[in-house]
Regions:
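Flexible, solvent-exposed loop/hinge segments and secondary-structure transition points
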Residues: 2-202
Length: 202
């Protein structure tokens, strides 16, 4: 009986100490992690809107306005955040969106996209992707450049060579990845056309 009580006391002490250590580690690392995430987001915004001086969040995860893309049929994509891209004078140059496709071949594909007020897509910046090496992972080199400085209301991918502004050359052997990215970009464009141009307070 005495041994059982001793073992229980030792186990309790270990649990308390472990909990205290974990709590301490969390407190120590929480701020640096938050700062790192903030820097990563800033860099992602700056990459798709290089001439903007500031970014102001106008819609966060779970915002009711995101229902617009579901109504349009984009149920395999979600918008995590929408930010106004502003000049040094405070003028709104356009918007940056953080978008996630849930239709990748090997998981979610997350990226930022910047759109000017005239509807021009500055481009996209891939934030998270884990597709097949040599195939879907080529999205960075094959797909990303094709979205730069394009003006289209909706994109479509082709396997025979892009012949117009709204066509994107598919990654050879990775049409699932291609479709996932294209449809998620289209979801962002849909949100811009149906919600942002419709009067987000500027």
């Amino acid at each position: 009986m005495k041994n059982m009580l001793r073992d229980a006391a030792i186990l309790f002490a270990i649990t308390v100490i472990a909990g205290a250590v974990l709590g301490f580690v969390y407190d120590v690392t929480k701020e640096p992690i938050a700062q790192q995430e903030a820097r990563a987001k800033q860099e992602a915004c700056q990459e798709v809107f290089a001439d903007a001086s500031a970014f102001e969040t106008v819609a966060e995860a779970g915002d009711a306005s995101y229902g617009a893309i579901l109504e349009a049929g984009y149920d395999k994509a979600s918008i995590e955040e929408v930010m106004k891209a502003q000049s040094s004078a405070g003028d709104v140059l356009g918007y940056v969106m953080i978008v996630t496709s849930h239709d990748g071949y090997n998981g979610d594909i997350r990226f930022s996209m910047g759109i000017r007020m005239d509807g021009t897509l500055n481009g996209i910046s891939l934030l998270a992707i884990s597709e097949t090496p040599g195939l879907g992972m080529r999205a960075e080199e094959v797909l990303k450049p094709q979205f730069a400085e394009k003006q289209a209301s909706v994109f479509a991918y082709t396997k025979t060579g892009a012949a117009s502004e709204d066509q994107i050359d598919a990654i050879s052997g990775a049409t699932i990845t291609t479709n996932a990215v294209v449809e998620a970009v289209n979801a962002g464009l849909c949100y811009f056309q149906n919600v942002l141009e419709g009067g987000v307070e500027q």
